[in-house]
Amino acid sequence: MSTKEKLINHVMKEEPIGSRNKVTVVGVGMVGMASAVSILLKDLCDELALVDVMEDKLKGEVMDLQHGGLFLKTHKIVGDKDYSVTANSRVVVVTAGARQQEGESRLNLVQRNVNIFKFIIPNIVKYSPNCILMVVSNPVDILTYVAWKLSGFPRHRVIGSGTNLDSARFRHIMGEKLHLHPSSCHGWIVGEHGDSSVPVWSGVNVAGVSLQTLNPKMGAEGDTENWKAVHKMVVDGAYEVIKLKGYTSWAIGMSVADLVESIVKNLHKVHPVSTLVKGMHGVKDEVFLSVPCVLGNSGLTDVIHMTLKPEEEKQLVKSAETLWGVQKELTL
Protein backbone atom coordinates (compact mmCIF):
# COMPACT_ATOMS: atom_id res chain seq x y z
CA MET A 1 0.00 0.00 0.00
CA SER A 2 1.17 3.52 -0.80
CA THR A 3 1.46 6.27 1.82
CA LYS A 4 -1.63 7.89 0.31
CA GLU A 5 -3.63 4.65 0.56
CA LYS A 6 -2.53 4.17 4.18
CA LEU A 7 -3.48 7.77 5.01
CA ILE A 8 -6.82 8.17 3.23
CA ASN A 9 -9.87 5.90 3.34
CA HIS A 10 -12.11 6.60 0.31
CA VAL A 11 -15.82 6.65 1.17
CA MET A 12 -17.05 7.17 -2.40
CA LYS A 13 -15.75 7.66 -5.93
CA GLU A 14 -15.95 11.37 -6.75
CA GLU A 15 -17.58 12.29 -10.06
CA PRO A 16 -15.87 15.22 -11.82
CA ILE A 17 -18.42 18.04 -12.14
CA GLY A 18 -16.18 20.73 -13.62
CA SER A 19 -15.71 24.30 -12.49
CA ARG A 20 -18.72 26.51 -11.81
CA ASN A 21 -16.80 29.78 -11.80
CA LYS A 22 -13.92 29.38 -14.20
CA VAL A 23 -12.13 32.53 -15.34
CA THR A 24 -9.54 32.69 -18.13
CA VAL A 25 -6.97 35.44 -18.65
CA VAL A 26 -5.45 35.59 -22.15
CA GLY A 27 -2.00 37.21 -22.05
CA VAL A 28 0.44 36.94 -19.13
CA GLY A 29 2.06 40.35 -19.49
CA MET A 30 1.98 42.98 -16.74
CA VAL A 31 -1.75 43.71 -17.13
CA GLY A 32 -2.71 40.05 -17.50
CA MET A 33 -0.88 39.00 -14.35
CA ALA A 34 -2.12 41.97 -12.30
CA SER A 35 -5.65 41.00 -13.39
CA ALA A 36 -5.05 37.34 -12.51
CA VAL A 37 -3.67 38.14 -9.05
CA SER A 38 -6.49 40.61 -8.33
CA ILE A 39 -9.09 37.98 -9.34
CA LEU A 40 -7.42 35.37 -7.11
CA LEU A 41 -7.14 37.68 -4.10
CA LYS A 42 -10.84 38.57 -4.38
CA ASP A 43 -11.66 34.83 -4.49
CA LEU A 44 -13.76 35.17 -7.66
CA CYS A 45 -13.16 31.80 -9.31
CA ASP A 46 -12.77 28.11 -8.48
CA GLU A 47 -10.46 27.67 -11.49
CA LEU A 48 -8.14 30.16 -13.17
CA ALA A 49 -6.72 29.44 -16.62
CA LEU A 50 -3.89 31.45 -18.20
CA VAL A 51 -3.03 31.41 -21.92
CA ASP A 52 -0.10 32.92 -23.81
CA VAL A 53 2.10 32.18 -26.80
CA MET A 54 5.28 32.64 -24.71
CA GLU A 55 5.47 29.16 -23.19
CA ASP A 56 8.33 29.64 -20.70
CA LYS A 57 6.94 32.86 -19.25
CA LEU A 58 3.48 31.27 -19.04
CA LYS A 59 4.84 28.18 -17.28
CA GLY A 60 6.79 30.34 -14.83
CA GLU A 61 3.81 32.55 -14.00
CA VAL A 62 1.53 29.53 -13.45
CA MET A 63 4.10 27.85 -11.17
CA ASP A 64 4.63 31.08 -9.24
CA LEU A 65 0.87 31.37 -8.59
CA GLN A 66 0.52 27.68 -7.76
CA HIS A 67 3.29 27.99 -5.15
CA GLY A 68 1.08 30.52 -3.36
CA GLY A 69 -1.89 28.14 -3.43
CA LEU A 70 -1.84 27.78 0.36
CA PHE A 71 -2.76 31.45 0.69
CA LEU A 72 -5.58 31.31 -1.87
CA LYS A 73 -9.05 29.78 -2.02
CA THR A 74 -8.82 28.97 -5.74
CA HIS A 75 -8.14 25.25 -5.90
CA LYS A 76 -7.06 25.00 -9.53
CA ILE A 77 -4.64 27.25 -11.45
CA VAL A 78 -3.70 26.03 -14.93
CA GLY A 79 -1.95 27.38 -18.01
CA ASP A 80 -1.20 26.36 -21.58
CA LYS A 81 -0.67 27.86 -24.99
CA ASP A 82 -3.40 25.49 -26.22
CA TYR A 83 -6.84 27.07 -25.79
CA SER A 84 -8.41 23.74 -24.72
CA VAL A 85 -7.21 24.71 -21.21
CA THR A 86 -9.80 27.52 -21.26
CA ALA A 87 -12.77 25.20 -21.93
CA ASN A 88 -16.06 26.11 -20.24
CA SER A 89 -14.91 29.45 -18.86
CA ARG A 90 -17.59 31.70 -17.46
CA VAL A 91 -15.58 34.88 -18.10
CA VAL A 92 -12.64 35.29 -20.50
CA VAL A 93 -10.46 38.38 -20.01
CA VAL A 94 -8.34 39.35 -23.04
CA THR A 95 -5.24 41.40 -22.19
CA ALA A 96 -3.01 40.16 -25.04
CA GLY A 97 -1.95 42.47 -27.84
CA ALA A 98 0.87 44.24 -29.62
CA ARG A 99 2.52 47.28 -28.05
CA GLN A 100 2.75 50.56 -29.93
CA GLN A 101 6.20 51.08 -31.39
CA GLU A 102 7.89 54.45 -31.59
CA GLY A 103 6.57 56.40 -34.57
CA GLU A 104 3.89 53.81 -35.32
CA SER A 105 0.47 55.11 -36.35
CA ARG A 106 -2.56 54.21 -34.26
CA LEU A 107 -4.21 52.58 -37.27
CA ASN A 108 -1.19 50.36 -37.87
CA LEU A 109 -1.16 49.28 -34.20
CA VAL A 110 -4.90 48.56 -34.35
CA GLN A 111 -4.52 46.44 -37.49
CA ARG A 112 -1.69 44.43 -35.86
CA ASN A 113 -3.93 43.79 -32.86
CA VAL A 114 -6.83 42.85 -35.14
CA ASN A 115 -4.58 40.19 -36.67
CA ILE A 116 -3.76 38.86 -33.18
CA PHE A 117 -7.48 38.87 -32.26
CA LYS A 118 -8.25 36.86 -35.43
CA PHE A 119 -6.39 33.98 -33.76
CA ILE A 120 -7.47 34.55 -30.12
CA ILE A 121 -11.22 35.18 -30.43
CA PRO A 122 -12.21 32.11 -32.54
CA ASN A 123 -10.30 29.89 -30.08
CA ILE A 124 -12.14 31.40 -27.11
CA VAL A 125 -15.49 30.91 -28.87
CA LYS A 126 -14.59 27.30 -29.78
CA TYR A 127 -13.96 26.24 -26.18
CA SER A 128 -16.26 28.61 -24.25
CA PRO A 129 -19.22 29.40 -26.54
CA ASN A 130 -21.32 30.69 -23.63
CA CYS A 131 -18.70 32.86 -21.92
CA ILE A 132 -18.73 36.58 -21.28
CA LEU A 133 -15.87 38.17 -23.18
CA MET A 134 -14.07 41.07 -21.52
CA VAL A 135 -11.58 43.01 -23.63
CA VAL A 136 -8.80 44.96 -21.88
CA SER A 137 -6.21 45.24 -24.70
CA ASN A 138 -5.74 48.73 -26.15
CA PRO A 139 -7.17 50.60 -27.95
CA VAL A 140 -9.94 48.95 -25.92
CA ASP A 141 -13.03 50.47 -27.57
CA ILE A 142 -12.00 49.50 -31.11
CA LEU A 143 -10.79 46.05 -30.04
CA THR A 144 -14.07 45.39 -28.20
CA TYR A 145 -15.86 46.12 -31.48
CA VAL A 146 -13.41 43.75 -33.24
CA ALA A 147 -14.01 41.01 -30.63
CA TRP A 148 -17.79 41.44 -31.01
CA LYS A 149 -17.55 41.12 -34.80
CA LEU A 150 -15.15 38.14 -34.74
CA SER A 151 -16.98 36.24 -31.97
CA GLY A 152 -20.51 36.50 -33.33
CA PHE A 153 -21.61 36.86 -29.69
CA PRO A 154 -24.64 38.99 -28.79
CA ARG A 155 -23.65 42.50 -27.66
CA HIS A 156 -24.46 41.82 -23.98
CA ARG A 157 -21.70 39.19 -23.81
CA VAL A 158 -18.88 41.37 -25.18
CA ILE A 159 -17.67 44.08 -22.80
CA GLY A 160 -14.68 46.42 -22.91
CA SER A 161 -13.00 47.47 -19.64
CA GLY A 162 -13.52 50.99 -20.99
CA THR A 163 -13.49 53.94 -18.60
CA ASN A 164 -13.95 51.92 -15.40
CA LEU A 165 -10.33 52.78 -14.54
CA ASP A 166 -10.57 56.37 -15.85
CA SER A 167 -13.54 56.90 -13.50
CA ALA A 168 -11.59 55.36 -10.60
CA ARG A 169 -8.68 57.73 -11.28
CA PHE A 170 -11.16 60.63 -11.47
CA ARG A 171 -12.69 59.74 -8.09
CA HIS A 172 -9.25 59.25 -6.52
CA ILE A 173 -8.02 62.71 -7.63
CA MET A 174 -11.35 64.27 -6.62
CA GLY A 175 -10.96 62.63 -3.20
CA GLU A 176 -7.44 64.02 -2.85
CA LYS A 177 -8.75 67.50 -3.65
CA LEU A 178 -11.64 67.26 -1.17
CA HIS A 179 -9.86 65.10 1.48
CA LEU A 180 -12.48 62.36 1.11
CA HIS A 181 -12.38 58.64 0.33
CA PRO A 182 -12.88 57.94 -3.42
CA SER A 183 -16.00 55.87 -2.66
CA SER A 184 -17.66 59.03 -1.29
CA CYS A 185 -16.81 61.03 -4.43
CA HIS A 186 -19.21 60.26 -7.26
CA GLY A 187 -18.29 61.11 -10.82
CA TRP A 188 -18.29 59.45 -14.21
CA ILE A 189 -15.87 59.48 -17.10
CA VAL A 190 -17.56 58.21 -20.27
CA GLY A 191 -16.76 57.89 -23.97
CA GLU A 192 -13.42 56.68 -25.27
CA HIS A 193 -10.91 55.21 -22.86
CA GLY A 194 -7.95 57.58 -22.90
CA ASP A 195 -7.24 60.97 -24.41
CA SER A 196 -10.73 61.92 -25.62
CA SER A 197 -12.66 60.65 -22.58
CA VAL A 198 -15.57 62.81 -21.41
CA PRO A 199 -15.97 63.90 -17.76
CA VAL A 200 -19.65 64.28 -16.82
CA TRP A 201 -19.27 67.38 -14.62
CA SER A 202 -23.05 67.77 -14.37
CA GLY A 203 -23.22 64.49 -12.42
CA VAL A 204 -20.30 65.02 -10.01
CA ASN A 205 -21.56 64.86 -6.42
CA VAL A 206 -20.73 64.08 -2.80
CA ALA A 207 -23.56 62.66 -0.66
CA GLY A 208 -26.05 63.72 -3.33
CA VAL A 209 -24.82 67.32 -3.32
CA SER A 210 -24.09 68.39 -6.90
CA LEU A 211 -20.71 70.12 -7.00
CA GLN A 212 -21.74 72.04 -10.11
CA THR A 213 -24.55 73.74 -8.16
CA LEU A 214 -21.91 74.91 -5.65
CA ASN A 215 -19.50 75.90 -8.42
CA PRO A 216 -21.42 76.52 -11.70
CA LYS A 217 -18.15 76.97 -13.64
CA MET A 218 -16.81 73.55 -12.58
CA GLY A 219 -14.93 71.94 -15.47
CA ALA A 220 -15.32 75.01 -17.67
CA GLU A 221 -13.13 77.98 -18.56
CA GLY A 222 -13.04 80.67 -15.89
CA ASP A 223 -13.22 78.19 -12.99
CA THR A 224 -10.92 79.72 -10.35
CA GLU A 225 -10.51 76.28 -8.69
CA ASN A 226 -9.41 74.77 -12.02
CA TRP A 227 -11.37 71.51 -11.74
CA LYS A 228 -10.61 70.94 -15.42
CA ALA A 229 -7.11 70.00 -14.28
CA VAL A 230 -8.61 66.97 -12.49
CA HIS A 231 -9.68 65.48 -15.83
CA LYS A 232 -6.30 66.36 -17.37
CA MET A 233 -4.63 64.44 -14.51
CA VAL A 234 -6.88 61.46 -15.29
CA VAL A 235 -5.81 61.51 -18.96
CA ASP A 236 -2.13 62.11 -18.13
CA GLY A 237 -2.14 59.57 -15.27
CA ALA A 238 -1.38 56.51 -17.39
CA TYR A 239 1.40 58.30 -19.30
CA GLU A 240 2.92 59.46 -16.00
CA VAL A 241 2.92 55.92 -14.57
CA ILE A 242 4.42 54.53 -17.81
CA LYS A 243 7.13 57.22 -17.73
CA LEU A 244 8.00 56.34 -14.12
CA LYS A 245 7.77 52.52 -14.06
CA GLY A 246 7.55 51.54 -17.73
CA TYR A 247 3.96 50.23 -17.82
CA THR A 248 0.64 50.33 -15.96
CA SER A 249 -0.59 47.20 -14.21
CA TRP A 250 -2.00 47.26 -10.68
CA ALA A 251 -4.88 49.72 -11.09
CA ILE A 252 -6.09 48.17 -14.35
CA GLY A 253 -5.77 44.70 -12.76
CA MET A 254 -7.94 45.79 -9.82
CA SER A 255 -10.39 47.41 -12.23
CA VAL A 256 -10.71 44.14 -14.19
CA ALA A 257 -11.33 42.17 -10.97
CA ASP A 258 -13.99 44.72 -9.99
CA LEU A 259 -15.83 44.04 -13.28
CA VAL A 260 -15.40 40.25 -13.03
CA GLU A 261 -16.82 40.36 -9.49
CA SER A 262 -19.99 42.12 -10.65
CA ILE A 263 -20.50 39.43 -13.29
CA VAL A 264 -19.76 36.24 -11.32
CA LYS A 265 -21.57 37.44 -8.18
CA ASN A 266 -24.52 38.83 -10.20
CA LEU A 267 -24.22 42.15 -8.33
CA HIS A 268 -26.17 44.31 -10.82
CA LYS A 269 -23.65 47.07 -10.16
CA VAL A 270 -23.35 50.01 -12.54
CA HIS A 271 -19.95 50.43 -14.23
CA PRO A 272 -18.72 52.67 -17.05
CA VAL A 273 -17.77 49.98 -19.58
CA SER A 274 -17.46 49.87 -23.34
CA THR A 275 -20.58 48.70 -25.18
CA LEU A 276 -22.32 49.25 -28.51
CA VAL A 277 -23.68 52.82 -28.34
CA LYS A 278 -25.21 53.18 -31.81
CA GLY A 279 -28.48 55.08 -31.44
CA MET A 280 -27.55 56.58 -28.05
CA HIS A 281 -26.63 60.23 -27.39
CA GLY A 282 -26.65 61.08 -31.10
CA VAL A 283 -24.13 58.36 -32.08
CA LYS A 284 -24.96 57.08 -35.58
CA ASP A 285 -22.16 54.58 -36.23
CA GLU A 286 -21.51 51.04 -34.99
CA VAL A 287 -18.97 51.94 -32.30
CA PHE A 288 -18.24 50.85 -28.75
CA LEU A 289 -17.85 53.57 -26.10
CA SER A 290 -18.19 53.62 -22.33
CA VAL A 291 -21.51 54.53 -20.76
CA PRO A 292 -22.90 53.46 -17.34
CA CYS A 293 -23.96 49.80 -17.68
CA VAL A 294 -25.42 47.19 -15.32
CA LEU A 295 -23.31 44.01 -15.01
CA GLY A 296 -24.57 40.64 -13.78
CA ASN A 297 -24.63 36.89 -14.49
CA SER A 298 -25.69 37.34 -18.11
CA GLY A 299 -23.10 40.03 -18.81
CA LEU A 300 -24.26 43.54 -19.62
CA THR A 301 -27.99 43.57 -18.84
CA ASP A 302 -28.92 47.28 -18.98
CA VAL A 303 -27.62 50.70 -19.99
CA ILE A 304 -28.36 53.74 -17.84
CA HIS A 305 -29.77 56.76 -19.70
CA MET A 306 -27.42 59.59 -18.75
CA THR A 307 -28.62 63.16 -18.75
CA LEU A 308 -25.78 64.86 -20.59
CA LYS A 309 -25.29 68.56 -21.21
CA PRO A 310 -25.13 69.50 -24.95
CA GLU A 311 -21.34 70.05 -24.70
CA GLU A 312 -20.83 66.60 -23.10
CA GLU A 313 -22.96 64.92 -25.78
CA LYS A 314 -21.02 66.77 -28.50
CA GLN A 315 -17.72 65.41 -27.12
CA LEU A 316 -19.18 61.88 -27.07
CA VAL A 317 -20.30 62.11 -30.72
CA LYS A 318 -16.86 63.48 -31.69
CA SER A 319 -15.21 60.47 -29.99
CA ALA A 320 -17.53 58.12 -31.87
CA GLU A 321 -16.69 59.73 -35.21
CA THR A 322 -12.94 59.43 -34.52
CA LEU A 323 -13.31 55.72 -33.67
CA TRP A 324 -15.46 55.03 -36.72
CA GLY A 325 -12.83 56.71 -38.89
CA VAL A 326 -10.31 54.09 -37.70
CA GLN A 327 -12.74 51.14 -37.67
CA LYS A 328 -13.95 51.52 -41.23
CA GLU A 329 -10.36 51.15 -42.48
CA LEU A 330 -9.83 47.82 -40.68
CA THR A 331 -9.63 44.47 -42.44
CA LEU A 332 -11.60 41.98 -40.35
From Swiss-Prot:
According to the UniProt entry, what is the EC number of this protein? 1.1.1.27
Where it sits in the cell: the answer is: Cytoplasm
Q: What cellular component GO annotations does this protein have?
A: cytoplasm
State the reactions this protein catalyses.
(S)-lactate + NAD(+) = pyruvate + NADH + H(+)
Task: Please give the biological process terms from Gene Ontology that the record holds.
Answer: lactate metabolic process
Q: Where does substrate bind?
A: 106, 138, 169, 248
Subunit comment: Homotetramer.
Q: What is this protein called?
A: L-lactate dehydrogenase A chain
